[in-house]
Amino acid sequence: MLTLTMQGGYDYDWLVIGSGFGGSVSALRLSEKGYNVGVLECGRRFADNEFPSSTGDFRRYFWRPKLGMKGIFRLTTFKDVSVVSGCGVGGGSLGYANTLYVPPKPFFEDKQWAQIADWESELAPHYAEAQRMLGVTTNTHDDPADQLLRELGEDLGVSDTYKKTPVGVFFGEPGKTVPDPFFDGQGPDRTGCQLCGRCMVGCPHGAKNTLVKNYLYLAERHGAHVSPERTVVAIRPFGSGGGAEGGGGAEGGGGTGGSGGTGGSGGTGGSGGAGAGGGQGDGSQGYEVESVRSGSWIRRDRQVHRAKGVVVAAGPLGTNLLLQRCKLGGSLPKISERLGELVRTNSEAILAVTVPEDYPDDLTKRVAISSSIYPDAYTHIETVTYGKDGNSMRRLYTLLVGDGTRVTRPLKLLGQMARHPGRLFKLLFAKEWSKRTIIVLVMQTLDNAMALRPKKGPFGSMWLSTEQDPERPNPTFIPVANKAAEWLAQRTGGVAQTSMTEALFNVPTTAHILGGAVIGADPEHGVVDAGQRVFGYENLLVCDGSAIPANVGVNPSLTITALAEHAMSRVPPAGQPSSEAADEPVAA
C-alpha cells in the first residue's frame, strides 16, 4: 500500500495527458474523488459553431499545426498502415462516427490477457456505466444505405446478423434545443439530431454526444483544468532528493514510496514487477511533465507542470511516441521492453462505392453509421457517410484492386485504369462525391499485429516506424471487404474504390489503431497491469487505446471508455488508503 504525504510543490494531484475517451473519463472520475486535476490537450477547443463547414476547410478540419491547420482529423502514414485519428478538446469524439458496440466474445478471450481475469464479467458494469455516460441509444432510423446492407446480408446468407447501431446521439425532436436530458440538468443544453450525416465532419447542431457534452463537461464543472494546444514532450519522475530525474529545477519534497497496491492521496501505486520498488525515480514522489505550444516553430512556450500522478491518454500514436521518448531518453527507463509491441489495426479495411449522379435515393439522411452485419464470425461490416460535406476525402480513394504486393497492386491499378477509363473519369471528376458515396468499413477480431519502433533523428528528434509481426502480419487485403464493395457497386451501378495507399503501396488504412502499451500479466508480457498502471512506476497510468491488447472487431470507443472506468474505479478517494480487494480483478 502506498500513501503519499508530500505537501506543496505540486501544480496538480493528477495530470492527464489527452482529452479523448480515456483522458476524459480519468479527468471526471479523479475530480469526483476530490483530486486537483489538470488536462493537457494538443488540439484546440471547438464550440459547435466552430467545426469546419466541410472537409475542404483544411484549416479547421485537418491537423497539421506547423502549417496552421489545427482541425479534428489527423492522417498519419507508415510503411505498413495509414492511420486516421482525432484531435482537439474531446479527442477522437469530435470526429468519430459515434458508434458504440460492446465487442464480441473473442476479444475478451484473447490469449494476451485472458489468464488475468474474466474480462467479460469484470468489465460488464463498466460498459454499462460507459453506455449511460455516453448516452448510448439504438438508432431507429432507416435509410437507403441500410436497405442495401440488409440485402447484402441476405445475399451472403447472414441476414440474421443485421443490426441497427448503438450510437451516442441525442435524437429528441430534430432541431429543437432542450435542457440537459442526460445528467439531471447538470449537463449542457442539447439539440435534437437532424440526420445530416456530418458526424465525422463535426456536428454543428449539438446533437452528437461528444466528450465535451458529458465526461469532460462534468469534469470541468468539478474543477478539472483543461489546457488546449499543449503538446507533452517529456515525463520525468522526481527522485528522492528534489528535482526530477534528468530534469531538475522542479520542487520536490519528502514522501514515502512503496510497491504494488493502489495509492493514497496521490493516486494508484505501481503494480510491482520490474523495478517497482520505492527507490529513486519510480514516481512515488511525483512527476514533472514538460509541454510546448502545439505547432510552434520558434516560440515554443515551454512549460513544466508538477503532479503527484500522471495519466497518459494521448491516443495510441501519441502515447507510444511519448513513452518511447521517455524510455530511450532515460527519464522512464524501467518501462517494459514490450513497449511498442502488439499494435493492432482492428484488422481493418476502408473502401468506398460512389453511386451514379442520377441515383434516386439520398444516402446521407442518417447518422454516420446506421447499421451493420457479420458476413462471418470474425468480420464486421458497416456502411458509413460523411454527409454532403466530405468531398475532399475523395482524394484518398482510387479504383478498386485485388490482392497483391507492393509491386503487383500498382500494376493492377494501372490495368484497372486501362480497362475501365469510364470509371476512372467518373471518379476523378465526380460531382458531389460525398453525397453519392457509401464508405465501407470492415473490422475483424482476428489475431494479427505489428510493432511501433522508435527512430531517432538529428537534434533529438524521434518518430515511430512500423514493423509487421512476422508470424501474424496485419492484413493488407481482406477478400470479403472487396466482395462487399463490388456487390454494392453492382447493385447501385456505382464505382467501387479502395484507399489510395492500399492500391499504390499495399498499405491498408485503419481508423482504429490500438495497442503498443498493452495490458499484460507482468512486464515480460505487457506494459501495464490489469489496472492500467505502468509496470515499474508508481502513479503512472495509461488509459487510452494503447492499453487494449487485442483486435476489438467493432468500433473501440466504448471499450476504451469502459477500461478507463475500470482503471479509475481502483483509484481511492483523495486522502484515503487503497483497498486491497479493489486491486484484484475477477479470476479467469
What spans do the regions from the language model cover?
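N-terminal glycine-rich phosphate/pyrophosphate-binding loop and immediately adjacent elements
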Residues: 1-111, 115-121, 291, 314, ...
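Glycine-rich loop(s) and the adjacent beta-strand/alpha-helix scaffold that form part
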Residues: 32, 43-53, 205, 213, ...
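Short hydrophobic beta-strand that contains or immediately precedes a catalytic carboxylate
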Residues: 39-40, 226-227, 542-543
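Conserved redox-cofactor binding core of oxidoreductases
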Residues: 118-232, 504-509
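FAD cofactor-binding and catalytic pocket of flavoenzymes
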Residues: 71, 77, 92, 96, ...
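Patatin-like phospholipase A catalytic core
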Residues: 143-193, 367-368, 377-447, 456, ...
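A glycine-rich dinucleotide-binding beta-alpha-beta segment and adjacent secondary-structure elements
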Residues: 70, 196-199, 233, 438-441, ...
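Intrinsically disordered, low-complexity terminal tails and inter-domain linkers enriched
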Residues: 240-282
